[in-house]
């Protein structure tokens, strides 16, 4: 058995004296593990870091075997990310989200979104909006997508500023006003369907993480006996600290 594919490194663990088991999210073969001979060496260390993109060749005698990887770096992001606390926490959290996907099950849209998210991690605010969008995409991929296209009560498609915590559907300003204290806020950058580069405030980011966090916890994590990762909390705290330092008085 042999295939080649693009991949993003999610995690690495030592195997034996010199080897390493590498976990990739690949474009066409999903989340997939393989053994890299000599992967524990200092020569391989810069390549085998979470967040780096690689061209992978996987070989095994049988499809169900762990198999072996040969990896070639195509985008080495890790060195830059290690200099920023939000990026370190962010890539760890993104990897934990990707691990919610079944192994060896292709999710090309998620792969492409992960790649775009990692490529735009230099700016803290952009990184936060992209990560919120990624969490929304993961909810949809796992069968728990939110309906933010129209008001659940009236069908209106404008002034959608709330989300029902029960149904996960948008609610308009007029319909939601009597119950505003019981509804979640829908951030402007999600309402406007922009690319996350503008139209957000600090409050929008807090609302966004509250929104995705609520549904991830209830629908995905708690049924698996899990909670939010420490990396998610670390990312949010790093973003909050950065925005507080750079706020205009």
Swiss-Prot record:
It holds the Pfam family RecO_C. The keyword Cell inner membrane does not apply. GO terms for cellular component: bacterial nucleoid. Keywords: DNA damage, DNA recombination, DNA repair. GO terms for biological process: DNA recombination; double-strand break repair. Involved in DNA repair and RecF pathway recombination. This is DNA repair protein RecO. It comes from Rhodopseudomonas palustris (strain BisB5).
